[in-house]
Design a protein with these regions (language model features):
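Generic N-terminal targeting/processing segments that precede catalytic cores or assembly contacts
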Residues: 1-390
C-alpha cells in the first residue's frame, strides 16, 4: 500500500516527506523533483519567504544508484529560514529560550491558530501555526513528484492550471496541449492558458495587495493517460472520486472540491449531463463525446482525463488584520500578522497535482501490484491486452 506522511514545522530545521509501498526499480530524476519544488514557489502574489527558501530535495533513504529499492523513501528539505528562528524554537529547553520566543496569542480568524490551541491546550498558537502552515506542502510536492515519476512510466501525466483568481475567471475549457504549454513556461505569472484572463487575474491580485488583503481562486488538475479500472464501486472508501476529493480538500485553504463539471451538473437535466459512449475501433477502446463526469463513474476511472478542481479561500493572514481576542488577556485585539502571500492559487495547483498523483499512484498499485517496476509493468501490460480483447 502506497502511503505518504510528512513531518516538520514552517520554521524548523527541515521538512521530511516519507513514502512507503513504492516498488523497486523506478528511476528517480532529482532534477525533476527539484523543478516541481521550484514550481510550487512560483506565482504572482507570493510572499518574501519564497526568496529565502531554495527547497533542494535531499533523498536520505530508499533510493540508490538513481532507482528506488523497495524501501521507504525519505526526502529532506532544508528550511533556510531556520537560522532566523533557532533561538525562538529550540529543540531543548535551553537557558534564555523564553526571552527569544515569538509568541502568537492573537489568533487569526480563518486559521488553525485558535482551534489548534484549544485542542492541544496551548496558550500560545505558535506551535499550531508552525505545523498548520502551508510551508508543509513542500513535502507533499516532493512526495508527489515521486508518484509522478511512477505514473510517467505508464504514459500518465498530471498537470494543473489556474481557472479563477478572485472575480476574474477563465471562461472556456482548456485543451490538454494548452495546459502542457503553460506548465512548461515557468515565467507564466499565474499559469493561466489565456493571456486576457490572466491579465484580469493579475489585476485582482494587485487590488488585494493595495488593500492589505488576500484573494482566493480556483485551480484545475488534469490527469491524462490514466487507464480505466482504477478505484472501485464496491465500498464507499474504495471510490476513487471520494479519495481524490479528500486528498485535494486536505490542502491548506482549500474549502471546496469539484470533480468534472459537478457544480453545473447539479442544476442541469440528466440528458444534458451524462457523457454518451461510443466505441473507437482504431484504439480498441470505449470513448466519450464529452467529459462532464471528469473521468470517473461509480468511483472508477473510465479512461477519460480526470478533472479535479480545488477552490481556495483567501489566505487567513492579512496585512490589515481583522479583530480577534487575545488568548491570555481575553481582550479585544487585532489578529497577529505573519509574513505571508497575497495569492497562492498557482502554488495550490502544484500541490493539487502532487496530491492527485499520490492518490492515483496508490490506486494504480492497488490495481496492478508489483514489488518491482518490472512486475508492475507485466501486470499492466496484461491488463492492456485484456482491454484490447474486451
Amino acid at each position: 500500500m502506497l502511503r505518504f506522511v510528512s513531518a516538520g514545522e514552517s520554521h524548523g530545521q527541515a521538512l521530511i516527506a516519507w513514502v512507503s509501498g513504492f516498488p523497486a526499480g523506478v528511476p528517480v530524476d532529482l532534477e525533476f523533483i527539484q523543478r516541481e519544488l521550484h514550481r510550487r514557489q512560483l506565482g504572482y502574489g507570493r510572499g518574501a519567504r519564497q526568496r529565502i527558501e531554495k527547497d533542494q530535495p535531499d533523498i536520505i533513504a530508499g533510493v540508490r544508484h538513481g532507482h528506488t529499492i523497495g524501501a521507504p523513501i525519505a526526502v529532506r528539505i532544508e528550511n533556510r529560514d531556520w537560522a532566523n528562528w533557532e533561538k525562538a524554537l529550540p529543540v531543548e529547553d535551553t537557558e534564555g529560550a523564553d526571552d527569544a520566543q515569538r509568541p502568537l496569542t492573537a489568533p487569526r480568524p480563518g486559521h488553525a491558530d485558535l482551534a489548534g490551541a484549544l485542542k492541544f491546550n496551548f496558550h500560545d498558537a505558535r506551535y499550531v501555526l508552525e505545523r498548520a502552515s502551508a510551508r508543509e506542502t513542500a513535502s507533499r510536492v516532493a512526495a508527489g513528484a515521486l508518484a509522478k515519476l511512477l505514473l510517467r512510466e505508464f504514459a500518465a501525466e498530471v498537470l494543473s492550471h489556474t481557472i479563477a483568481v478572485g472575480h476574474a475567471r477563465l471562461e472556456r475549457d482548456a485543451a490538454w496541449e494548452e495546459i502542457e504549454t503553460v506548465c512548461k513556461n515557468l515565467e507564466s505569472p499565474l499559469r493561466c492558458v489565456d493571456g486576457t484572463a490572466e491579465a484580469k487575474m493579475k489585476a485582482e491580485v494587485d487590488h488585494a495587495l493595495r488593500a492589505g488583503d488576500s484573494v482566493g481562486g480556483v485551480f484545475e488538475v488534469i490527469a491524462h493517460g490514466i487507464p480505466p479500472g482504477l478505484g472501485s464501486h464496491a465500498q464507499w472508501d474504495e471510490k476513487l472520486d471520494a479519495r481524490l476529493a479528500r486528498a485535494v480538500m486536505s490542502i491548506q485553504a482549500v474549502k471546496a472540491v469539484e470533480l468534472g463539471s459537478g457544480v453545473s451538473n447539479s442544476s442541469s437535466y440528466g440528458s444534458e449531463v451524462q457523457d454518451e459512449i461510443r466505441y473507437d475501433a482504431p484504439s480498441k477502446r470505449f470513448a466519450r463525446s464529452s467529459n462532464r463526469a471528469g473521468g470517473l463513474e461509480g468511483g472508477i476511472t473510465n479512461g477519460q482525463d480526470i478533472v479535479v478542481r480545488g477552490y481556495l479561500k483567501p489566505i487567513s493572514t492579512l496585512r490589515r488584520p481583522l479583530l480577534s481576542a487575545d488568548m491570555k488577556t481575553k481582550e479585544a485585539v487585532k489578529a497577529a500578522y505573519e509574513r505571508s502571500d497575497v495569492c497562492v492559487v498557482p502554488a495550490g495547483g502544484v500541490v493539487g497535482e502532487a496530491m492527485v498523483s499520490l492518490e492515483l499512484a496508490a490506486a494504480f498499485l492497488e490495481k496492478f501490484g508489483g514489488d518491482s517496476l518490472a512486475e508492475t509493468r507485466r501486470n499492466f501490460d496484461g491488463n492492456q491486452k485484456q482491454l484490447d480483447a474486451f
